[in-house]
Amino acid sequence: MPARCWLCPSFCALTGKGVVVMLRAIRKPIRHKHKMTDQTAAPRDMANAIRALAMDAVQLADSGHPGMPMGMADVATVLFSKFLKFDASEPNWPDRDRFILSAGHGSMLLYSLLHLTGYADMTLDELKKFRQLGARTAGHPEYGHASGIETTTGPLGQGLGNSVGFALAERILAERFGRDVVDHYTYVIAGDGCLMEGVGQEAITLAGHLGLGRLIVLFDDNGISIDGPTSLSTSEDHKKRFAAAGWHVQAVDGHDAEAVTRAIRKARNVTDKPSLIACKTVIGYGAPTKAGTAATHGSPLGKDEIAGARAKLGWNHEPFDIPEAVFSAWRKIGARGKSARRKWTKNLAAMGPEDRAEFDRRQKGDIPPAVDEAIAAFKAKLAAEKPSWATRKSSQEALEVINPVLPDTVGGSADLTGSNNTKTATLKGASRADTAGRYIYYGIREHAMAAAMNGMALHGGIIPYGGTFMVFTDYCRPSIRLSALMGVRVIYVMTHDSIGLGEDGPTHQPVEHLPALRAIPNLQVLRPADAIETAECWQIALEAKHVPSVLALTRQNLPTVRGAGDENLCAKGAYILAGEETAPIRLIASGSEVQLALAARDLLAKDGLAAAVVSMPSWELFAAQEDTYRNKVMGGDGTVRVACEAATGFGWERWLGSKGAFVGMKGFGASAKAPELYKHFGITAEAIAQAARRLAQ
């Protein structure tokens, strides 16, 4: 006889040994539709395999988040078994659907799916090493640790922001190469936390505005946060919120496989707007005393609770043991995409030779020779004309020669296009009407811009760059950090890089931002001194496949301080711009302060003191050079070194040695014209020269 549900008066026909039901405030019962046997693998059995692996791995690690994987197992089973286009044997197939676990704390959901569907590097041993040093199964999913992990998530909302970039990249590439080779969806599992985060709201409104019809978000609507019920901190109606942002919205019982199937099918047919499917779920589904509570969010369930969950779920198997019928069914799902991939391969082979060559090149991330040729010609022109441009203007002029020969680039700005100089003549704005546009008007959404650029870079075939004022790197720093952590080619065009921006004052003058950005590992900060260096810095950023770049650019005009030459001198991070290698004094500067160092050298020459000026656009690149080169540029230990930068001096001691001084900012800026500010704060050629004189005595 069927057993009585543990929280409702109705009978469920799952098994006579025990059942599990939805735990909601209204205590609505779940109506099970599948009987569990040893011979068949019903959807509920397959979902329970995910639940069991999540419980077991978290318990073994004595750390982790079992609640979300248990709650979203039914939804994930439907998605992977009926809709997601992938081939586990070819995880990097360019036309696969992208699955993003924005709620990255539920990483065992993803790891379980990757193991069950047959990704070669996600073995059972890896699941057993969950959260251990050196394992592919880190606490939160990390891009590059294992196949099938499309992006690094964990900081909530980032995956949702990434998804906008994934969907944009798919749409732009489909316009270029056609639906025969680019025809996939982006699916996201997001939780309450993702929707509470500011980056989540920015991403939601941007996706709705752009009409990203192949973006489908599955919202784990479990009503629980770490502190307890979400009613403690929020009372908004997410469904109305998404609808107001231009999304197609549905709500379903997340434990009703048929309802979830219908909803995803309907969402896939909505082509003019992104889709939200709010899946009402029970966090920790199946746990006899903890389901539906915050206790399942971020702690192991405990042996007794797991035993009870096994009984409730009818899962009478040892830890990490998956019945053959269930395992076989999952492996068939992992191989189901082979036929679609083979058809795609034929379509790819049928492309014209030029289109095929470009598609392959862009997937590899290679830069065509035409870019180097264009930059070389541009540098020669600059050397002849010697313009006095702000480096933001120099950046735009560099892009004017790069973008026509590099179709990979997708530019944008956070409502500062005219100030960042990020749009060029050949780029059209992306919109619902123009889905081929390579320029994104992000609006005042700096965080979503950065997160979306990460998504575009991760998708492949796109090199994204986007601009805002440098002070607003604070608004997108979490995504910049993830760019560096993942090692993706994203180019941040950050203008108005110092007190040189002038009258807007200290709220807009970045003084601590250069050291703060330099503190991020695997991020190269490039601060060019003139138009030629700016062109070289763009070349460096484009060639760095696995390193994101920040271009720190001026508002104020700067003179051309060097000739062209074939060699990219900025590529070594620092070089002697003027003077002799044997000079006993080094005047070191970056960006707009290089001209001050050159003027200070002239002042010292009048005193009979020989100095060499070092232009240092990138600390990171210079640090990567051999000791012999660094010593050549900086001089020996006894060399007098004076550094100048219109920023705080944090970190400069690394380069100054025993006889060094720094000329720069000691606090926040002020509102006035740039020349007046430089004089007011003592950032002058005379101040540099005086520091050198003092140290040379």
Describe each PLM feature range:
Residues 132-144, 168, 172-183, 200-321, ...:
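Thiamine diphosphate
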Residues 72-210, 423-424, 456:
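Cofactor-binding active-site loop characterized by glycine-rich and histidine/acidic residues
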Residues 348-489, 567-575, 581-583, 588-591, ...:
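Non-catalytic terminal/interface segments that mediate subunit docking, oligomerization
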Residues 119-129, 207-217, 244-245, 484-497, ...:
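A glycine-rich helix N-cap at a beta->alpha junction
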Residues 61, 97-98, 149-152, 179-197, ...:
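A short, small-residue-rich loop immediately preceding and capping a beta-strand
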Residues 40-51, 84-86, 123-145, 417-431, ...:
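Acidic-glycine-rich active-site phosphate/pyrophosphate-binding loop
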